[in-house]
């Protein structure tokens, strides 16, 4: 199930759909991407201009799991749709933590690191 939620999160970013992204990501989530830290709400505002044309998740693994939290790690390969978004393209290690709040799973932490 968390794998599907991660895919939905990436798909909403690809589609520039900040409303769908905000449904999946807690407003106060900690997002650390490309050396930049922001909240889930701040990151959702960036999604409409995210600028990736494709993504592929591989190596998905559950690192830790309880009834209330799940931490995952995977590799995502992204493609940028225009040259000015080239810094968004590449291969990244990603770790995310999801929390079950009142029966709904929401992302509360996400961090990526470019694979060199």
Per-range role (PLM):
Residues 1-15, 19-23, 28-116:
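A beta-strand edge to alpha-helix "cap/lid" segment located at domain peripheries
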């Amino acid at each position: 199930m968390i794998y599907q939620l991660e895919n939905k999160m990436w798909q909403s970013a690809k589609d520039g759909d900040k409303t769908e992204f905000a449904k999946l990501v807690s407003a106060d989530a900690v997002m650390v991407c490309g050396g930049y830290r922001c909240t889930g709400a701040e990151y959702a505002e960036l999604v409409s201009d995210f600028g990736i044309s494709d993504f592929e998740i591989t190596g998905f693994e559950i690192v830790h799991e309880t009834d209330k939290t799940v931490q995952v790690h995977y590799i995502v390969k992204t493609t940028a749709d225009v040259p000015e978004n080239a810094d968004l393209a590449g291969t990244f290690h990603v770790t995310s933590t999801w929390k079950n709040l009142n029966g709904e799973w929401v992302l509360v932490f996400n961090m990526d690191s470019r694979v060199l």
